[in-house]
């Protein structure tokens, strides 16, 4: 509204919809087409190459071989996840914290790496031995939601979280999209014995029913990144250089602590 632009939205139900949906936006004569996520990588690159006069941006991905009319909007969530790991290590009562992902892809494991590194740093600084369950940053092995459709598999997210809880973790960082709701269900059922650190957006706003179990959230400033891309198109200043959100520019960080702010 602030920029006075019209918005057209399409939602993909499966990967078969990716190319069709992007083509529909091209046919609508959109000046900028924004896709979201690693899974749309190849389709977005192909569309950008086929339509050099259309501007594209992709959130949460940095495609290889992208043309100059495609701008990656990415976030250094390793920085904020590091803070989340340090915080979790400081708050755990069991000496064990956990994390799991939706799929083993870079935009997921960057959170898990940062989280594990934050715990490791806490241990070094405080002389502690807090364990990270669900992810080994050195071997890049860990827990992921089972197929099919792991980012939507809430039941799979719940069972994966429950495994970590059963192993003694009392704080979990789920990096699994909608499947992360399963982790919220699992910790809520624990009766106050465990909690979650949410990702992507402020969980107390997006998952309000579970706010009492959300310590904080590792957010991405996706709204700011997309706004800036739209403004750049309108001002004639758009280019394909990656936007990289960091702690320094508040492109990522930890949200408010809400009930845990004490």
Which residue stretches match the model-derived regions?
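A residue-level marker of the well-folded mature domains of exported/periplasmic proteins
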Residues: 1-262
